[in-house]
């Protein structure tokens, strides 16, 4: 009756956030479930599992003033019949854990100041093997994999190393600023959710208050009550909410003034947004319908934060160092792009013939620059796709920065008849997809594929894949299944380089996953958005300045 599942918390005092598997609403009982093994020799918990659970206790202590003596805390190892272990708070170990947390933050701040080169130079398998473990697992699997990663980081040319270091620093700084907002303007960081006064958040449209729950439903079997419909009270005429469908948000109840640091949080995404109501889909639905949304409860909704973009950027930079030497030289401008002068068009595209021919004769990459209204997406992109498909073995990856632009690409494919002749698959989230194109999403496209071999064959047969750069970066394993002769990136001038480099560097077996790419955009229009100022993001390394 009083049990919450997957309740989340943010603790400013400890600098921690977390999600508890199971907890009583009065904080008296806390259970953390583990599907893996316990310490089987001593029939007790593993230390890292215990520390995780103890940090949750710390959050309840510092956020809600709970005493450890009044909390019953358990680790549940679900694969064992006697796996429910009662645990007790360990003050010294807790302080050591917070010290480690602060050390991690210190190093993240160093990375934002350019320490990656120094850290890479110091890396070795001995350094990483802190406990000096041995045995078959370490010797045959872990150490060789770590050594391969270290070699990739160290055995690169000075130019590749300079590129990696500068963009690693850039991403690290962006990650820090997206959390803290920096010393000059905290409102741009996630911490602005509690640093910024309520009236300023309301003026900026970054919080919705006074919400009441109208309905709770389940989106499917085993999901719990994860669809929450909220009534939005009448707002001032000049109020403009800074929320849109698909946004990650935090929902919480409050009594006097909303403050996410003092409440139990539920995280999810906006499924639908109207002036007087909104529907959220929670990441973790509640099994008890009445556990949230009592008659007297009012709620607030604020923006959530994710490290996904930064993590994708780091992975992309590592993919760049791991790429084929020829592709790295091309991306760094060490070698010029090649031309195929004898290539001819298969189709007739009227006044676009000259442009499409130039694009087809470009072997490595092609840049299409033009202001809005010149037909870059509606005509040029369509004709480039049609010409590419006229070659029987060509597969195409179509990308853009925003979901709205991807919707436009999907509309071009369907309205032109291309999709009817050559069905496409869209990579992405249903929440951020126009309803017309939901049937093309990956999960629905594979409904008729009960076996892994069926999925592989369907992926191999499908010649067009569409998605945002974020969606593809989240699913880089696509390139283990699929090789593309062509990638076309629309809105390219709005995309930060680290968001593209991993895709352009991807490998399929021992070859480039993408043979050729086309960048479409207008550098005079909307630029890529970064938290750093031009001075902070300036490139001073001569090796990089020499390649532009």
Where are each of the predicted segments found?
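Pre-ATPase regulatory/linker segments immediately N-terminal to the P-loop/RecA-like helicase/translocase core
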Residues: 76-82, 91-112, 237-357, 361, ...
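Pre-Walker A (Motif I) flank of P-loop NTPase domains
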Residues: 362-368, 393-395
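Mg2+/Mn2+-dependent nuclease catalytic core
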Residues: 2-102
């Amino acid at each position: 009756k009083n049990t919450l599942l997957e309740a989340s918390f943010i603790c400013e005092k400890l600098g921690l956030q977390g999600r508890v598997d199971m907890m009583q609403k009065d904080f008296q009982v806390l259970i953390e479930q583990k599907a893996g093994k316990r310490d089987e020799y001593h029939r007790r918990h593993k230390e890292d599992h215990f520390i995780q659970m103890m940090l949750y206790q710390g959050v309840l202590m510092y956020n809600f003033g709970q005493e450890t003596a009044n909390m019953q805390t358990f680790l549940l190892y679900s694969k064992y019949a006697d796996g429910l272990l009662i645990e007790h708070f360990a003050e010294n170990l807790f302080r050591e854990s917070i010290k480690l947390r602060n050390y991690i933050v210190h190093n993240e701040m160093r990375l934002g100041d350019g320490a990656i080169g120094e850290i890479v130079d110091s890396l070795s398998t001995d350094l990483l093997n802190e406990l000096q473990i041995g045995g078959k697992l370490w010797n045959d699997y872990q150490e060789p994999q770590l050594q391969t990663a270290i070699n990739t980081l160290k055995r690169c040319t000075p130019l590749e190393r300079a590129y990696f270091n500068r963009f690693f620093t850039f991403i690290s700084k962006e990650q820090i600023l997206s959390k803290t907002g920096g010393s000059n303007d905290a409102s741009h960081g996630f911490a602005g959710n509690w640093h910024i006064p309520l009236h300023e958040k309301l003026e900026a449209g970054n919080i919705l208050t006074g919400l009441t729950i109208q309905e709770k439903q389940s989106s499917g079997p085993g999901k719990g009550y994860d669809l929450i419909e909220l009534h939005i009270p009448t707002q001032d005429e000049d109020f403009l909410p800074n929320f849109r469908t698909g946004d990650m948000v935090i929902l919480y109840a409050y009594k006097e003034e909303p403050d996410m640091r003092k409440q139990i949080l539920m995280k999810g995404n906006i499924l639908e947004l109207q002036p007087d109501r909104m529907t959220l889909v929670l990441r973790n639905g509640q099994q008890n319908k009445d556990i949230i949304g009592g008659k007297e409860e009012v709620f607030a909704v604020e923006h959530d934060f994710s490290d996904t973009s930064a993590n994708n950027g780091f992975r992309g930079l590592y993919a760049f160092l791991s790429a084929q030497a020829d592709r790295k030289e091309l991306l760094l401008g060490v070698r010029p792009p090649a031309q195929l002068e004898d290539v001819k068009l298969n189709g007739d595209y009227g006044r676009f013939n000259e442009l499409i021919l130039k694009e087809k004769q470009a072997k490595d990459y092609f840049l299409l620059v033009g202001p809005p209204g010149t037909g870059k997406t509606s005509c040029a992109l369509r004709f480039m796709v049609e010409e590419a498909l006229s070659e029987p073995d060509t597969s195409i990856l179509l990308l853009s920065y925003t979901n709205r632009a991807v919707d436009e690409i999907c509309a071009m494919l369907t309205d032109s008849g291309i999709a009817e002749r050559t069905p496409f698959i869209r990579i992405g989230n249903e929440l951020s997809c126009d309803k017309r194109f939901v049937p093309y999403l990956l999960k629905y496209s594979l409904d008729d594929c009960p076996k892994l071999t069926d999925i592989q064959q369907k992926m191999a047969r499908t010649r067009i894949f569409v998605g945002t750069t974020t969606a593809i970066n989240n699913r880089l394993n696509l390139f283990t299944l699929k090789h593309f002769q062509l990638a076309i990136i629309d809105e390219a001038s709005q995309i930060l380089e680290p968001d593209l480099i991993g895709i352009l560097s991807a490998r399929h077996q021992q070859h480039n996953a993408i043979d050729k790419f086309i960048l479409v955009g207008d550098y005079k229009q909307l630029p890529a958005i970064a938290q750093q100022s031009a001075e902070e993001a300036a490139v001073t390394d001569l090796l990089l300045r020499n390649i532009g």
